[in-house]
């Protein structure tokens, strides 16, 4: 004997549940008979909705990964100080941190070099200025990326996700959060400088 299809219609008039029973006598409370077409359409719609969400999430993750890579590349390009470029690869950052720690320990100068330049002794004041510039740069782009990632997670249209690019202007709460974080970081950096200069 063929099973009987049933459906449950919600307050909005949309089918919220479907199923099968052996006979009309076993229809669940609040349900009514449904056609085979209604039964199949319900599951097709659920499958389609799931597929769309899965695709959107995959596109978001891919875009976020791209933005992460762009963030790293942008940081590693470095900063300009006194007309010279200082790269900020992970090793470069470690080197600048080491110079800064040497200054904290009392060093008045420390050997280092700009991109394409020969090594020379940098004075403590220049090391401090380079360190501050480097930290501000890393903090800015890292915070910007984080806010951009949060913005991407709010997008519900695949085309909007695909349009996102690193360096685009943030808006609303995302820009406000970026500004707040940078203002806080600047205060902390100024406190460090003030203590070093006595």
Walk through the language-model features, giving the residues of each:
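A preference for well-ordered globular domain cores
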Residues: 2-4, 10-198
């Amino acid at each position: 004997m063929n099973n009987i299809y049933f459906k449950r219609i919600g307050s909005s008039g949309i089918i919220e549940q479907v199923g099968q029973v052996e006979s009309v006598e076993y229809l669940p409370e609040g349900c009514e008979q449904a056609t085979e077409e209604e039964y199949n359409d319900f599951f097709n719609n659920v499958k389609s909705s799931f597929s769309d969400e899965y695709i959107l999430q995959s596109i978001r993750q891919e875009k976020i990964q791209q933005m992460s890579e762009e963030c790293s590349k942008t940081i590693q390009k470095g900063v300009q100080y006194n007309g010279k470029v200082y790269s900020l690869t992970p090793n470069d950052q470690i080197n600048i941190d080491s110079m800064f720690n040497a200054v904290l320990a009392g060093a008045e100068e420390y050997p280092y070099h700009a991109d394409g330049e020969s090594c020379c002794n940098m004075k403590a004041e220049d090391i401090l200025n380079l360190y501050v510039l480097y930290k501000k740069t890393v903090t800015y782009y890292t915070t910007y990326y984080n806010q951009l990632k949060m913005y991407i997670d709010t997008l519900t249209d695949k085309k909007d996700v695909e349009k996102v690019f690193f360096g685009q202007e943030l808006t609303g709460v995302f820009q406000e959060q970026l500004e707040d974080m940078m203002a806080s970081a600047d205060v902390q950096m100024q406190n460090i400088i003030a203590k070093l200069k006595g």
